[in-house]
C-alpha cells in the first residue's frame, strides 16, 4: 500500500549524510521524509567520538555556513576543543572536538524533530520505485510505499555489510545493526558501477581498568574554540582531558605473530581500506622501522566509562586484541567492552554522478556519504547537505547547484569524486585544494553564506548576524586605513615598542598590521588605534585580510584564469574517438569519465596539457566550443 501523502524528497538513512540532507531539504520548504531503520540511532557516531581535524574541520565550517547542523551539534556535545596547526598559517589551521556520543546524538535528534516540513519514519527500505529511469519512491520492509519527486541514498556501510573479527564474519551494517541486503541487491540491478570498500574500528576499553596516572594528559585549548559561526563557548559541556600511550615492540610482535589470523592478510577481506586511517596491522607492517606508534585514549562521553583508543583499529581475533591492548603502558590490566572489527560494504562509483550528486542514469536519485566512497562524518555531512539541497531544488523544478573548487572544500570533494572517482575510502585534506589560502575555516561564511541565503538554507537570524559581521569588518578596516601615526608623534614611542624596526615614515593602522611582528590585539591595545572590535570573528578577519592581502589577490588572479577552463563545457554525448590526434589512452579515459568541462578533463590522470590543446582546437573547428555564464 502507498502512504496517504506524497513527499517532495525522501532521505534513506539517518547518519551524518542523511540528517544533513533531511535538514537541508526541509529548510528549503520541501516536504521531506527521513526513513531510518532506528530513530534512536539518528546522528550516531559509529566510529571515533570526534568531529573536525585537518580538512575535515573546514568541511564542518562550510556546512555551518550553509545553515547545516553538524557544527551546532558538536558545540553542544564537545568535551574537548582544540585548534590543530595553531602555530601555522590560517589556511591550514583546523578545529577538532572530542564528542560525548550521547549528547551529540541528542542534539541531532532534537534538531530533526523540531524542523518544520520534516517527517521521520522508522522502517528499513528494501526497494526503490523506478519508472522510465526516474525514481518516484521507496518501499519499506513492511511493504509500505512512499512517493516522492527525489530520493537521496545515505546508507553508510549498511549495503550488504559484512563484519570481520579474525577469520569469523557475519552480516551487519555496523556493530549491533542489521545490514541492508535487499536494497543492495536492488541497486545492483540498476545501471550503476558497484565495488566493495572496507573500514574498521578499534576495541573500546573500560576506563576503570586503565592506569591513567602513568600516562601523559592532553588538554583542550583555553580559551575554547567554537565550531559554529552562530555558537559560543558557553554552550560547551564540561571539558575533559585525553591521554596518550604508545605501542611498543611487544605490541608489534603480537601483531606480526598473528597475521595469519587477520582477515586482511589472509585474503578474506576483498574491499580496500582507508589509506589515511590504517589498521594497527597495516601500520606495523608498512612502517616496520618504527618501534612505537602514538595512541590517544579518548573518552566516549561524560557519563560513559568507555574509552576509544585512537590508533589501534583492528580486525584481529578477540584474544589477539586483548594481547595488543594489554601490551601498552597503563593498559596492563585493561578490559575490552566492545571488540574492534572491520566492515566491508558496497559503494557506487561516484563518476556516475553529476556534481549535484544526482545519478547520471536515474533521474531524481541522489547519493551521499560512504556510498560514494568517502570516509568520515564530515565528508558525509557535506555531501548530505549538497544532495539534500539539490534534491529539494529538483523537486521544485529548479536547476541544481554545486560549489566550484575555488569556492569550497565541498567543491573540491565533489569534483574529485565525480571527475576522478576513488578506489579507496576518500578523506579530505587541505593538500587536496589548489586554492587553500582562499578556503580557510575562518572565512567559510564569507564564501558561502550569501549563496546559502539565495538557496533558502540560511535563516533570518544567521543572515542578520552575517551582515553585522560584514559591516564590522568593513568599518574596522576603514578605521585602520584612516588612522595614522608619524615618527614624531607622541604615540610613536608606544608603537615602536612593538616593532622590530622603528617608524621611519607616517604609517596607517593597516600598514602597521601588515608587519609580521604586529598582531591586531597588540595594535588595538595602543592608545592611537584603540579600541578593538568586540566581535572576535570580525577582528580575526580584519587581521587575516590585511596581513595576507597580497597573497590573496595573487591567488584570486589564478582562480580567474582557471575559471576559463572550468567554464568551457564539454558535450555530455561526445564520443572522444571522433577527436583526431588524441592517444588511445586519453580517448579511453575521457570516454570513461565523461568530464563536464575542460577543467574537469585536465584533472584526469593521464590527460596531458597537449591533449587538452588538441581537444580545444577540435571543439572550435566543430563549432562546439561553449562557455557557461
Swiss-Prot record:
Compartmental location: Cytoplasm
Pfam families with a match to the protein in the record: GIDA, GIDA_C_1st, SAM_GIDA_C
One biological process term in Gene Ontology: tRNA methylation
Cofactor(s) it depends on: FAD
Coiled-coil residues: none
Domain of life: Bacteria
Binding residues annotated for NAD(+), in chain numbering: 273-287
A single GO cellular-component term on record: cytosol
Keyword terms of this UniProt record: Cytoplasm, FAD, Flavoprotein, NAD, tRNA processing
InterPro entries (UniProt xref): FAD/NAD-bd_sf (IPR036188), GIDA_C_N (IPR049312), MnmG (IPR004416), MnmG-rel (IPR002218), MnmG-rel_CS (IPR020595), MnmG_C (IPR026904), MnmG_C_subdom (IPR047001), MnmG_C_subdom_sf (IPR044920)
GO MF, one annotated term: flavin adenine dinucleotide binding
Function: NAD-binding protein involved in the addition of a carboxymethylaminomethyl (cmnm) group at the wobble position (U34) of certain tRNAs, forming tRNA-cmnm(5)s(2)U34.
Family (UniProt): Belongs to the MnmG family.
HAMAP family: MnmG_GidA (MF_00129)
Quaternary context: Homodimer. Heterotetramer of two MnmE and two MnmG subunits.
NCBIfam families: mnmG_gidA
Name used for this protein in its record: tRNA uridine 5-carboxymethylaminomethyl modification enzyme MnmG
Name of the gene encoding the protein in the UniProt record: mnmG
